[in-house]
Each structure stands twice: as C-alpha cells, then as structure tokens.
Amino acid sequence: MTASSSDGAHGAVDRKLLDILVCPITKGPLEFDAARQELISRGARLAYPIRDGIPIMLPEEARKID
C-alpha cells in the first residue's frame, strides 16, 4: 500500500493502520489519497472514505471510481 504523509489539515490517519488495511472485497492493497481523504482499491474500483481520521471500510459507503 502506498501512503502519503498527512499534514493533519484533513485529519491524520495512523500510518501503521494504513499499512495493515486491505480492501474488504478483494483483500488487495489500498492506496491513500491524502487530497480526497480516501483509500483507493484499484482491484474493486472503489474509494473508501476517511472521516475524522477513521477509514470507513464498508463497501456500501465506498465511492465507485473509473
């Protein structure tokens, strides 16, 4: 998984947490999009939101991506 460092402006996510999270659908790696505060699953083509520093790993909460 690739994780960018966060400046805390949008709510920091613990780097260790990002290193262990995987997509709940594909079990594949996630990429951290700091600008959008999302975890991206390329395999599932979904973006999981991060709210108040907490990743919301529910497929029904994820945004579909192209």
Curated annotation (Swiss-Prot):
GO terms for cellular component: cytosol. InterPro entries: Trm112-like. It holds the Pfam family Trm112p. HAMAP family: UPF0434. Belongs to the UPF0434 family. This is UPF0434 protein RPE_0408. It comes from Rhodopseudomonas palustris (strain BisA53).
